[in-house]
């Protein structure tokens, strides 16, 4: 009897256990199916070709795919499909540099100016603040991000020497825009310089050094060498705005964005990043350096109390209720993102083979964060609990610096922010995004709506006031001066419209009453049709080169101020300066001079 009871109990236990396991399995399958369906819906909503992704949860890897690797051939994405991930490759390159530091070849505080002495450095702070390897890794060197001719240049070859990216006639290409180490400002040039440092130290091509490191990381399907869809059939086709194919093209700043990989290799890389710097019992990166991958250090914003920013490889981000360390990447026809949550040993990566400006790629981050069930961060303060007197920091703030120096005027006019005080903090207004509120949570510390922790900090460097979110820094500026700029721009644009209309009318009426000087600037504006046509006939990859289109644009745009000036002088000679046409010409001349002073005219993209 006793054994019968034991047998019945065992059978019952077995049935219940089996039922429980089947329930768990069905739940997991259901969750996986829901995630797959949600991602497929996002692909359809944003007209994206395909995606590969992987999640890592405390040792458990889960990789998947959806959509097309090549629409024309009807080839679908697979786990072994290769993708190009742009700036996500910077994280891998950073590990390569940290490996050189770990092995004693170089040091974080080594001067880059000493390691690359043949380049024309123009660092005005070199005596007290030389640019170091740490500055390049953390994007705090002060160097500009990228020039148009470095980005769009069809003459670039896969083996073009890296130094050619810095041998342009521009004498200020290696001039920091702020004291190195004091601010964050994303720089593709900086990571290309890291590639040059690797070559100088190892005496081999950086691609070969990095590929040997990839073997140590067990990333055998990845490479820093140039790969095309023609040379490797496993590489997915890139797409622009839906179904417009874009083959892989070589880059001048290739250490900053040339990296081909697979979702399985990136899963392996996530596992390494969440570890202590070891791979197959070999020390790749010191544990102390691994702890700094996403931790900012030394900037004014960090020293003023803001913990968010960029570390040696990743940026600390506060999104969707979770705090992670991430790095996105874009390249021709691809978008990718890598995120880690070290405290929970979790992470994810995804790559999409479509670059669509209207797509909200952050929706994929939200989906994968939810799939990983990342623990939601909790506030370490109560909103509105800061009782110290709040200083009014209202006013206009301009990007300092902006992302690309050659577009500084555009960012000044269209990408500044304005703060107005509220009961609990400040409203932030911008032409580029919807208004949002930042709530006071500490002395000059603020939290943005939808964030968990402090997102902004206000500080003073002894000369200027700034507000920063760790990745974008704004300097306080004069609102009245910006409004004056807008007045000149609007008045000048109105004058251009009238000038074109008057020029057309005068041209139709003929020259019975003599030649009207307004026809001179009008004719120059008509000549803009030449570069417009030539640009429509060339590849966008030639945009940064000296072509017939770019040269004609430079000549015509340079000629417009002179045409306005000559026309004004002719009106003066004819004693017609008080005429309507003369007034319009003078206002157009004012606009031309204004744009010239602000380095907008002449329009040159190859400098």
Go through each PLM region and give its residues.
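Short, surface-exposed loop or secondary-structure junction motifs
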Residues: 60, 65-71, 124-342
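Active-site SXXK
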Residues: 59, 84-112, 191-199, 266, ...
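Short, conserved catalytic-motif segment at the N-terminal edge
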Residues: 35-83, 105-107, 121-126, 154-159, ...
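Short, well-ordered beta-strand elements
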Residues: 62-64, 337-354, 465-469
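Peripheral terminal and inter-domain segments
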Residues: 362-607
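Boundary at the C-terminal end of the N-terminal hydrophobic targeting segment
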Residues: 30-32
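Bacterial N-terminal signal peptides
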Residues: 17-27
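N-terminal secretory signal peptides that target proteins for export/translocation
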Residues: 1-12
């Amino acid at each position: 009897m006793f054994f019968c009871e034991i047998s019945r109990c065992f059978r019952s236990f077995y049935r219940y256990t089996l039922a429980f396991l089947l329930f768990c399995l069905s739940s997991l399958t259901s969750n996986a199916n829901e995630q797959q369906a949600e991602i497929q819906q996002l692909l359809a909503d944003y007209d994206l070709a395909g995606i590969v992704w992987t999640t890592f949860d405390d040792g458990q890897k889960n990789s998947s795919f959806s959509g097309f690797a090549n629409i024309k051939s009807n080839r679908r994405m697979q786990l072994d499909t290769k993708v190009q991930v742009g700036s996500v490759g910077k994280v891998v390159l950073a590990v390569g540099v940290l490996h050189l530091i770990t092995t004693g070849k170089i040091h974080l505080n080594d001067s880059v100016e000493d390691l690359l002495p043949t380049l024309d450095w123009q660092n005005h702070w070199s005596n007290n603040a030389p640019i170091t390897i740490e500055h390049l890794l953390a994007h705090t060197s002060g160097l500009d991000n990228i020039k148009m001719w470095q980005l769009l240049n069809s003459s670039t070859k896969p083996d073009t020497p890296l130094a050619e990216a810095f041998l342009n006639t521009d004498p200020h290409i290696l001039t920091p825009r702020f004291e190195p180490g004091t601010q964050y400002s994303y720089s593709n040039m900086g990571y290309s310089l890291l590639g040059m440092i690797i070559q100088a130290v190892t005496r081999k091509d950086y691609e070969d050094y990095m590929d040997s490191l990839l073997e140590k990381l067990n990333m055998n399907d990845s490479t820093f060498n140039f790969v095309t869809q023609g040379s490797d059939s496993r590489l997915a086709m890139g797409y622009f705005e839906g179904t417009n194919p874009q083959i892989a093209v070589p880059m001048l700043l290739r250490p900053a964005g040339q990296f081909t990989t697979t979702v399985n290799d990136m899963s392996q890389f996530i596992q390494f990043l969440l570890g202590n710097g070891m791979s197959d019992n070999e020390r790749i990166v010191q544990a102390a350096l691994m702890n700094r991958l996403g931790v900012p250090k030394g900037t004014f914003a960090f020293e003023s109390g803001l913990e968010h920013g960029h570390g040696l490889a990743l940026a600390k981000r506060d999104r969707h209720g979770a705090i992670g360390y991430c790095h996105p990447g874009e390249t021709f026809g691809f978008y990718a993102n890598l995120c880690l949550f070290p405290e929970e040993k979790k992470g994810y990566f995804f790559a999409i083979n479509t670059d669509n400006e209207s797509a909200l790629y952050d929706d994929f981050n939200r989906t994968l964060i939810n799939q990983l069930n990342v623990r939601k961060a909790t506030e370490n303060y109560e909103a509105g609990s800061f009782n110290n007197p709040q200083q009014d920091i209202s006013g206009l703030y301009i990007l300092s610096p902006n992302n690309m120096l050659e577009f500084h005027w555009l960012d000044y006019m269209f990408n500044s922010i304005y703060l107005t005080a509220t009961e609990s903090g400040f409203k932030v207004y911008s032409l580029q995004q919807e208004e949002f509120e930042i709530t006071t949570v500490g002395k000059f510390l603020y939290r943005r709506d939808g964030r968990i922790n402090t997102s902004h900090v206000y500080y003073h460097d002894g000369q200027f006031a700034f507000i920063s979110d760790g990745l974008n820094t704004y300097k306080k500026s004069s609102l009245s001066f910006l409004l004056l700029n807008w007045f000149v721009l609007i008045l000048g644009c109105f004058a251009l419209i009238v000038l074109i209309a008057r020029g057309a009318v005068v041209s139709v009426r003929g020259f019975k009453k003599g030649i009207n000087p307004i026809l001179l600037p009008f004719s120059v504006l008509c000549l803009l049709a030449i570069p417009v046509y030539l640009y429509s006939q060339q590849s966008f990859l030639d945009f940064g080169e000296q072509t017939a289109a770019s040269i004609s644009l430079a000549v015509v745009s340079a000629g417009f101020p002179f045409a306005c000036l000559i026309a004004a002088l002719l009106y003066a000679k004819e004693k017609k300066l008080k005429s309507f046409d003369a007034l319009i010409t003078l206002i157009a001349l004012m606009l031309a001079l204004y744009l010239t002073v602000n380095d907008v005219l002449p329009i040159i993209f190859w400098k």
